[in-house]
Amino acid sequence: KRGHDVVLCDKNEELGGLMKLASVPIAKQDLAKVTQYMVRKLEEAGVEIRLNCEVNKNMLQNEFADYEVVMSNGASPVVIQPFTTFKHWATADDILGGKAFPGRRIVVIGGGSVGCETADYLAPLVYDRLPRDRKVTVIEMAPEVMSTESGPGRSLLVQRMMKKGIELICNAKVEKVEENKIYYSINGETHCISDADTLIFAVGYRPDKALADTLNELKITYHTIGDANSVGTIQDAIHAGYDLAKEL
């Protein structure tokens, strides 16, 4: 709108990033409309969109040598490496994105919004006529799940989880993971889960710094917004993009 020649590159086959995954959990499908709206506005503004396009050193040195660079490549889910010894593990993103498939005895490490929404998504439906015989357990270090969230959305989700029989273990810390066992402690007392067949990580995200390293190596000045700068909410990312666009 301000007259710039804008090229938007995304390494994925469609735009949206984590918004696509955020719209998968129960009662959050409407988030997909946000992405649809923004894509429509991009097209109306004449932005050149390149999908399946991961920006590399050669592109930065040649094709985009005279461009202002804005890095908004998001964040990656944190994986606790010592716990990957479990026989079958995945991140919540893997599950919601259909890249991994859980068994019937699932343990989710992390009781934040992502962990709880994933557990809710995987648990048997309330009043399901054909129960999937799936047991879901959430282990959270804080005194309660989704402790940083508030409002009716949190209350409804927690109520739904309890109705579905999801086991919520709070004030707990996973201490050790073996191929077939998960050990956690509460107030110094150790407990063991030995019947789980799937371990899911929902312990937050870490900004993806790979492109930043390349830009720094080439001594290219750039701007960082969204989760690539600091992991936050959808609103945070949208506002950051808008605020930066006003300055360029």
What are these regions (language model features)?
Residues 1-15, 51-62, 72-149, 185-248:
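Rossmann-like dinucleotide/flavin-binding elements
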Residues 17-67, 147-172, 180:
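N-terminal Rossmann-like dinucleotide/flavin-binding domain of flavoprotein oxidoreductases
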